[in-house]
């Protein structure tokens, strides 16, 4: 993926995350639940002071440090490995985008705005940036696993 396309995609993904959070705050009261696709997905405005599943509540300094380290390393890795396959680049793009999206919330608000609730399973409420992070990490693990299988 060319550098310009990567940066444009990064900006677009972070903007999509931030716009989704802005919309939720503007249209749904804190704690309110609105069915989006009944029985499948609801929108719920939640202020998360922790990480996934609300662990490590009120430890913002910890998340800021970890986020800076992970994003910094991902950018360093991209810069020093210019010939990565498209799947690894996509994985790192998603990880960086998700990290930046939640980082903006932590710096600006001291919490992360979550809003997506899966009605059909008992699962934590999450946001668009969390989705990027999850898909990015899964994709990166698959890439690394495949490399190990093929001895690369």
From Swiss-Prot:
GO terms for molecular function: aspartic-type endopeptidase activity. Pathway: Protein modification; lipoprotein biosynthesis (signal peptide cleavage). Its EC number is 3.4.23.36. The active site is at residues 114, 130. The chain crosses the membrane at residues 5-25, 61-81, 84-104, 125-145. Keywords: Aspartyl protease, Cell membrane, Hydrolase, Membrane, Protease, Transmembrane, Transmembrane helix. One of its GO terms (cellular component) is plasma membrane. It is an enzyme of class 3 (hydrolase). NCBIfam families: lspA. This is Lipoprotein signal peptidase. It comes from Streptococcus pyogenes serotype M5 (strain Manfredo). The lineage of its organism: Bacteria, Bacillati, Bacillota, Bacilli, Lactobacillales.
């Amino acid at each position: 993926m060319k550098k310009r396309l990567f940066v444009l995609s990064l900006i677009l993904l972070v903007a999509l995350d931030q716009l989704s959070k802005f919309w939720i705050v503007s249209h749904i009261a804190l704690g309110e639940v609105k069915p989006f696709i009944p029985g499948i997905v609801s929108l719920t405005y939640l202020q998360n002071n922790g990480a996934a599943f609300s662990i490590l509540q009120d430890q913002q300094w910890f998340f800021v440090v970890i986020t800076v380290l992970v994003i910094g390393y991902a950018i360093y890795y991209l810069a020093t490995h210019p010939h990565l396959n498209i799947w690894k680049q996509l994985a790192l793009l998603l990880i960086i985008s998700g990290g930046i999206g939640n980082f903006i919330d932590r710096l600006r608000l001291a919490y992360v705005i979550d809003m997506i609730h899966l009605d059909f399973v008992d699962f934590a409420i999450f946001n668009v940036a969390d989705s990027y992070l999850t898909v990015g990490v899964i994709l990166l693990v698959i890439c690394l696993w495949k490399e190990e299988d093929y001895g690369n």
